[in-house]
Amino acid sequence: MLALRSGLRTALAPRVLTPQVCSPFATGPRQSNGTFYEFRTYFLKPSKTNEFLENFKNSVHLRTAHSEMIGYWTVEFGGRTNRVFHIWKYDNFAHRTAVRKALAKDKEWQERFLIPNLAFIDKQEVEITYLVPWCKIGTPPKEGVYELATFQMKPGGPALWGNAFKRAVNAHVELGYSTLVGVFHTEYGALNRVHVLWWNESADSRAAGRHWSHEDPRVVAAVRESVSYLESQQNTFLIPTSFSPLK
């Protein structure tokens, strides 16, 4: 009987809830907002890259009639070449589904571009990303070049490394040598991956700015903290196409 009473007291006693760790990268607010960005990478046949780009340039209005294109670039260096990289904005997943269905029924898009050019593509990669809550899409001051810095962070999620990563990015922003376009956290694709898109006036101005930043104690301290959570990093140098909204 005493054992039974003790068990009942334990079962009925108020539970003490363990505080949850919050992070500025938490997916909740982004998913409630719904807006996400689709990263598409096409690996093209070397002999067909220029033809593919010219054909898309002539048909881009057919595609953008269905959803917003943020930017369209070719990869100059930083991995495999003969690649194109583009970003598309969607209000939510229902919006994307509706767009894909509409494109499948758009005969002009299918006949003028998609069907004739599919054979030019060796491989496609697609990621679904959200802008981090502390970042909005930036507007570059003029035409230039772009760098996509991709960080593969340690497992544990933004609750583990989000604050340190934010401080590292902002330390570079505050120096003013480069314009931050966006910070994107992958939802579908490799997890614990963050993409940071930067604008620079030129490759040489970027190199000079990076050299300067490495001598700034604020940047050095912030990066030293963030890098403890980093598994790998890859930088890709991007050239905007003539039809890219982001130039």
Curated annotation (Swiss-Prot):
The modification N6-succinyllysine is found at residues 45, 48, 57, 166. It comes from the Eukaryota. InterPro entries: Dimeric_a/b-barrel (IPR011008), NIPSNAP (IPR012577), NipSnap_domain (IPR051557). Keywords: Cytoplasm. GO terms for cellular component: cytosol; mitochondrion. Pfam families: NIPSNAP. It is found in: Cytoplasm, Cytosol. Its main location: cytoplasm. One of its GO terms (biological process) is mitophagy. Belongs to the NipSnap family. This is Protein NipSnap homolog 3B.
